[in-house]
């Protein structure tokens, strides 16, 4: 949120050279300041305190994803959404039952209506405060209801996670 023109310009400049791209949200805007919601457990706690509840963090994350999907990023805009439940990265410490979250239902319906596909990745399995894939539980059930295409991914930011697909078999 707030960097749409810069993103669109970069996509217009480099989009023709990209085989694949993913639209994802890591930063959320509170008032006029940006916070990286998946940087650290301490940063996530700071965001919870600023917004007043874990539920409010989830809602703002989903609202930001809705804005990203609705934004005009040009003809090279990614058609896949990354780690849709990244907000759960610290769910072991910040528990929240999101099964009745209206914003999440609105988001999944929008993804379906717009024909997006979703990144189903295993990175969360290896995060000590997460322990689940970045599409699991209630969200996975909701996605199945809407018959949204999933694309397997590792979200590997280092070589040690590239070969972790055996773990994924347990979750499919």
State the predicted function of each range:
Residues 1-113:
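Extended substrate/RNA-proximal surfaces in nucleic-acid metabolism proteins
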Residues 94-172:
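Charged catalytic cores and adjacent phosphate/nucleic-acid-binding surfaces used
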């Amino acid at each position: 949120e707030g960097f749409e023109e810069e993103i669109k310009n970069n996509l217009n400049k480099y989009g023709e050279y990209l085989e694949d791209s993913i639209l994802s949200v890591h930063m959320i805007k509170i008032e006029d300041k940006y916070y990286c919601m998946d940087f650290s457990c301490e940063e996530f706690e700071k965001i919870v305190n600023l917004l007043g509840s874990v539920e409010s963090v989830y809602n703002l994350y989903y609202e930001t994803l809705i804005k990203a999907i609705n934004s005009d990023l040009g003809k090279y805009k990614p058609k896949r959404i990354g780690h849709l439940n990244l907000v759960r990265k610290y769910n072991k410490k910040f528990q929240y039952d999101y099964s009745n979250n209206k914003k999440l239902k609105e988001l999944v319906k929008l993804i379906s209506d717009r024909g997006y596909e979703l990144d189903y990745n295993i990175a969360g399995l290896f995060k000590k405060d997460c322990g689940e894939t970045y599409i699991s539980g209630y969200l996975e059930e909701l996605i199945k209801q809407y018959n949204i295409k999933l694309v397997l991914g590792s979200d590997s930011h280092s070589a040690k996670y590239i070969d972790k697909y055996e773990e994924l078999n347990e979750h499919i």
